[in-house]
Amino acid sequence: MIPEHFKQNTSLEISVFGFPVQMDYMFYWPEKREHDQKDPLVSHIEYRAESGIVSETGYRSHFFFTQALVGTDYKTIAELVTGIAENLAIENGYQSPARGQMTLF
């Protein structure tokens, strides 16, 4: 069963490897229409950043199957979307700098 705290739509500012990222999390995508609506099969996250951390343009749209939330170790929406964003950043070519090294990304 999907934990109740994931069943909402919200906007947050998160930090992805030290870079600020605006995020819109939409469990009910595109929106919740009925009070007793069944859980959706797919949910959506939009990431926007001034830096190119999540994509070259600073914008990234990500869909995921809500079934992935069943039994997850993530305790909050912020943890979930930060974990996904960090994976997207690595997929985008981000490499964390060595200890003490500055980054130009």
Describe every region a protein language model picked out.
Residues 1-5:
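Short, hydrophobic/π-rich interface segment
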